[in-house]
From Swiss-Prot:
Keywords: Acyltransferase, Cytoplasm, Transferase. Its EC number is 2.3.1.181. InterPro entries: aa-tRNA-synth_II/BPL/LPL (IPR045864), BPL_LPL_catalytic (IPR004143), Octanoyltransferase (IPR000544), Octanoyltransferase_CS (IPR020605). This is Octanoyltransferase. Residues 43-231 form the BPL/LPL catalytic domain. Pathway: Protein modification; protein lipoylation via endogenous pathway; protein N(6)-(lipoyl)lysine from octanoyl-[acyl-carrier-protein]: step 1/2. It comes from Salinibacter ruber (strain DSM 13855 / M31). Substrate binds at residues 88-95, 161-163, 174-176. One of its GO terms (molecular function) is lipoyl(octanoyl) transferase activity. One of its GO terms (cellular component) is cytoplasm. It is found in: Cytoplasm.
């Protein structure tokens, strides 16, 4: 067993990727991690953290209520968005430009086999990232994700949504941190099925939110620290080449 692969996370900073392509990538990496742990002897692959942006898309989790999508799918097409029903936990949410989406493909057998602890660790990575930008992120009892407030700006509001799926302790799906997101897109849904709280972004909470690319750095650093793992970061074409070699899936560069 390779000790380097045992505790290595490859963070792939990909830029903008379609939801369909990112989902296919997740499935292929998850399949590869599961196959590696079934091998005799096990041959652990590195864990993978996909960091990217999506074009406008709404997703509904397997336990979600379609009534929380407040407009028709035809109306979403009119505003340039798509809609997908998917297998993660959680309700309806939005992904789009200005939002950092993170998909950890981790074999929790090599960290800890506790899904609640895993979610709290994801939250902690985002709380620490928010703090890097002068924003105090918090948890809310009974609700997954990272929140801001209540404070003089208003009541509790969600800055980062989370929803995960796990198969044989290998994770997929993950988190969506609003950086400079156009929050008007959330007017078309009841975000995460919670109708008594709003949403926010780093840009709404601070004068210096950075860009999505900027925020990838601290997120990657905090993942390495919290999972006690060695992190290798790959950007752009290097990340796409790595993933194509790993999965056979082609990842188009933004704008191509």
């Amino acid at each position: 067993m390779s000790s380097s692969a045992q505790n290595e996370i490859v963070a792939c900073h990909l830029g903008r990727v379609s939801y369909e392509r990112a989902r296919a990538l997740q499935e292929r990496v998850q399949e590869r991690l599961i196959a590696a742990k079934r091998a005799e002897p096990p041959e652990p692959e590195p864990h993978v953290l996909l960091l990217l942006e999506h074009p406008p898309v709404y997703t509904l989790g397997k336990s979600g209520d379609a009534a929380n999508l407040l407009v028709s799918e035809e109306r979403l097409e009119e505003v340039g968005a798509t809609f997908h029903r998917i297998g993660r936990g959680g309700d309806v949410t939005f992904h789009g430009p200005g939002q950092l989406v993170g998909y950890p493909l981790f074999d929790l057998d090599r960290f800890f086999t506790d899904l609640g602890r895993y979610l709290r660790t994801l939250e902690e990575a985002i709380i620490r990232t928010c703090a890097d930008y002068g924003v105090t992120g918090t948890r809310v009892d009974g609700r997954t994700g990272v929140w801001v407030g209540p404070d003089d700006r208003g009541p509790e509001r969600k800055i980062c949504a989370m929803g995960v799926r796990c198969s044989r302790w290998v994770t997929m799906h993950g988190f969506a941190l609003n950086v400079t997101t156009d929050l008007d897109y959330f007017d078309h849904i009841v975000p995460c099925g919670i109708d008594d709280r709003g949403v926010t972004s780093l840009a709404a909470e601070t004068d210096a939110p950075g860009t999505v690319d900027d925020v990838c750095g601290p997120v990657t650093e905090h993942f390495g620290a919290l999972f006690d793992a060695e992190v290798t970061t790959r950007h752009g074409d290097d990340a796409r080449s790595f993933l194509r070699g790993l999965t056979g899936e082609r990842v188009e560069a933004p704008g191509r």
